[in-house]
């Protein structure tokens, strides 16, 4: 999508679908825009999307990079996929969990989220990836190429046969 010059701006679990052989499909492009912004400035400016998946720069009504805000939302989706709950309510100063990330206290963020989880539930690679994807400063967030090169992404891959066996 980004390679085609499009930013989604409303990525959330409800908009991530799978076909019958578990290929990922993205749905609902109602808020999509050119990744360089509608005015060609290189930035998007409108506050659109589902608030709990919005990057902080959107909440702050700053011009934003479409790819960066989409990857921020992907970090939230990935966290939910792993834990079955979001990492925070909204990426704003008032949210205690997001405030920890803003203050560079990822250690406390992960300590809080590790309560009631088995020891080692979150791998260091997973924590590193999610922390970077949810960075307050969009220039500190990884690109898709960075994510694909990340150790967590390159880890063990579940095969289609594994998935189908799980649902059999």
Model-derived features with residue positions:
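Catalytic-loop of the protein kinase fold
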Residues: 2-18
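Conserved activation segment of eukaryotic-like protein kinases, specifically the C-terminal portion
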Residues: 45-58
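Conserved end of the kinase activation segment
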Residues: 58-68
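Hydrophobic anchor on a C-lobe helix of Hanks-type protein kinase catalytic domains
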Residues: 81-82
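C-terminal lobe of the eukaryotic/viral protein kinase catalytic domain
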Residues: 86-135
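Terminal C-lobe "cap" of eukaryotic-type protein kinase domains
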Residues: 135-140, 144-160
